[in-house]
């Protein structure tokens, strides 16, 4: 970001979080696979963020670059949740018979010591995006439902 800011005054820096889409590895696909293979999962309940559907991100970036309102924008799914909430919704929508149990980051780290450290709060506010293009990102649950309706379960 600093390089871009130093290089030009005409830039769009777009920040997102908890991104998932139809291609590649992501949390949704991981949970679906684990939910198929296991009866129970322990998922962190003390880290909050905004699940973001890649299609929504792409759509809003396209709208944004049609303006000349350069700057830094947050572009994430509307609303926030924990990884536990996200995983629970994935299991519900996928029809998996897997119980999702909440745990703390500390408990998770003791079970999986090689897991990556994550921030406790990575939620972003899309205010500048709303003010610039007059449009809001979809609620994370609505976007996830559409995603789940279009993937093989």
Residue ranges and their predicted role:
Residues 2-49, 56:
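NAD(P)-dependent short-chain dehydrogenase/reductase
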Residues 82-84, 88, 107-152:
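Conserved C-terminal active-site "lid" loop/helix of NAD(P)H-dependent oxidoreductases
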Residues 43-48, 73-80, 132:
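Glycine-rich Rossmann NAD(P)(H)-binding loop
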Residues 55-63, 141, 145:
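Amphipathic alpha-helical segments that line or abut small-molecule/effector binding pockets
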Residues 18, 27, 70, 83-86, ...:
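Tryptophan-centric aromatic hotspots in well-structured domains and transmembrane helices
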Residues 12, 41, 50, 79, ...:
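Residues that recognize and position ribonucleotide moieties
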Residues 1, 27-28, 54, 58, ...:
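A general structural signal for well-ordered alpha-helical segments in protein cores
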Residues 60, 67-115:
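Mid/C-terminal beta-alpha module of Rossmann-like enzyme folds, strongest
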